């Protein structure tokens, strides 16, 4: 099932959306698609895209933003007119960490018994 779908502002491009993700999450995304391709509708999935690419296409998405997407799945979406922005699994779930923490405390778990991981990067990239 689809995470969420949004209609985006006029004039936004694939790279423009990827740059917004960088600004929000502070992590460089892997992007499949033409940098200047217009984005009108986006599908968002936290964690892995899994088999939800078909749902994104059916919803009319020009781009999928997700945490993980296999290479061949990304190529399939790309050849069918849908760009893919891959944030990293952990990065895509970071916005939910605080929400889940609050809910667990509401259910009676003491905050002193909670250890939340995922708010700081646990991995890094090496280049050059």
Regions found by a protein language model. Give the residues of each.
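Hydrophobic structural segments
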Residues: 1-128
């Amino acid at each position: 099932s689809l995470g969420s779908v949004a209609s985006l502002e006029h004039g936004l491009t694939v790279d423009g959306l990827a740059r917004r993700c960088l600004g929000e999450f502070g992590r460089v995304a892997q992007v499949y698609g033409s940098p200047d391709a217009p984005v009108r509708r986006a599908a968002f999935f936290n964690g892995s895209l899994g088999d939800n690419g078909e749902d994104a296409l059916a919803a009319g998405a020009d781009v999928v933003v997700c945490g993980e997407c296999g290479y061949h799945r990304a190529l399939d979406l790309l050849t069918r007119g849908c760009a893919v922005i891959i944030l990293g699994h952990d990065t895509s779930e970071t916005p939910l960490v605080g929400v889940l923490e609050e809910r667990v405390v509401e259910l009676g778990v003491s905050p002193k018994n909670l250890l939340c991981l995922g708010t700081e990067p646990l991995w890094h990239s090496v280049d050059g």
